[in-house]
Amino acid sequence: KVTTGDSQVMLALASGKSIRFEEAKTRPMGRTASGVRGITLQHENDEVIGMVAVNDMESNILVVSEKGYGKRSKLEDYRITNRGGKGVKTLNISEKTGDLVAIKNVDDSNDLMIINKSGLTIRMAVEDLRVMGRATQGVRLINIKDSDSIAAVAKVAHQEDADEVLEEGAEDAIEDGTENDTDTKENQE
């Protein structure tokens, strides 16, 4: 997502911490510059797992752990701080939840696609997830085996919206008389 210069930035760590700061606190730099510190890592094996550019202050923050737990929290639960700090707890990390693997900026008009490493993919409406406090464990979003973990999380357009667009496109094609203009296997045989 493109920032506006007035956006806010959120960074999240695998250890379950995140930080929110003003984009204006990072000065423009050249391509070869090493950058500035966004968040302080908790330990030597910690890593930044994601970044969100926040332009809509009414949106929610969704986080997902490697063992399929996740939650959605209000953006206002994360106070604005200076970049480079330790951050605040965004998910209660435990052996049950595993490390944090994804952070997304969502609202009720989004769906969530979750893929685990064994290839199972699920799609769920963000509006089905209740808003929870910032420092909670979350709820199980996907059942995974002990040896498996989450591979990827993506925010996509809400399914009903996609169906409506397809239906409108089909209606337009019928009105234009172009519904049979596409080459399908059946038409080619």
Model regions: which residues?
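C-terminal interaction appendages of subunits in large macromolecular complexes
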Residues: K1-E189
